[in-house]
């Protein structure tokens, strides 16, 4: 899938991510999890934040590569896991088309699967999510961005007009 499928952009700041993860944790706080499995790389930071909020000390990873920048390609399992997920919380930043989610569900069919953000195509594959975003929306996560100087608007307009 190419960048052409994205017509909107949603930028998530660090503050927004913390608020969203904490809100998701409010839905999970009554449950008792043996551990957390983060889907790398996108699920690492949400999993760390969730582990802190739920006081879960055991965190593992399943490593699947599915994106090259904004192009979604075939799945490559780089590290699997040796249990069915019973009693475990499975965490990713988002579910998009569901390709990664399907593969991980096969590996960990008994895990409780949560994502912070969900798109319509992948939403049925997770047990819980916090925020739904449009299928054609590219989500910019804070770990993918840097701070850069932006020229004042008046200077941008003047340089464009000259």
UniProtKB/Swiss-Prot annotation:
UniProt: 5-phospho-alpha-D-ribose 1-diphosphate binding residues: 41-42, 92-100
BP-aspect Gene Ontology terms: GMP salvage; purine ribonucleoside salvage; XMP salvage
Gene3D superfamilies recorded: 3.40.50.2020
Binding locations of xanthine: 96, 139
Binding positions (GMP): 96-100, 138-139
Pathway: Purine metabolism; GMP biosynthesis via salvage pathway; GMP from guanine: step 1/1; Purine metabolism; XMP biosynthesis via salvage pathway; XMP from xanthine: step 1/1
Binding-site list for guanine: 96, 139
InterPro entries for the chain: PRibTrfase_dom (IPR000836), PRTase-like (IPR029057), Xanthine_Guanine_PRibTrfase (IPR023747)
Cofactors, names only: Mg(2+)
Catalytic reaction list: GMP + diphosphate = guanine + 5-phospho-alpha-D-ribose 1-diphosphate; XMP + diphosphate = xanthine + 5-phospho-alpha-D-ribose 1-diphosphate; IMP + diphosphate = hypoxanthine + 5-phospho-alpha-D-ribose 1-diphosphate
Keyword ATP-binding (UniProt): no
Annotated Gene Ontology cellular component terms: plasma membrane
Any one Pfam family match given in the protein's UniProt record, by short name: Pribosyltran
Membrane-related topology note: Peripheral membrane protein
Protein EC: 2.4.2.-, 2.4.2.22
Major location category of this protein: membrane
UniProt key word Membrane: yes
Cell compartment(s), UniProt: Cell inner membrane
Binding site for Mg(2+): 93
Enzyme class, broadest EC rank: transferase
Top-rank lineage group of the source organism: Bacteria
Any one GO molecular function term: magnesium ion binding
Self-association and partners: Homotetramer.
Protein family per UniProt: Belongs to the purine/pyrimidine phosphoribosyltransferase family. XGPT subfamily.
Protein purpose: Purine salvage pathway enzyme that catalyzes the transfer of the ribosyl-5-phosphate group from 5-phospho-alpha-D-ribose 1-diphosphate (PRPP) to the N9 position of the 6-oxopurines guanine and xanthine to form the corresponding ribonucleotides GMP (guanosine 5'-monophosphate) and XMP (xanthosine 5'-monophosphate), with the release of PPi. To a lesser extent, also acts on hypoxanthine.
Protein name: Xanthine-guanine phosphoribosyltransferase
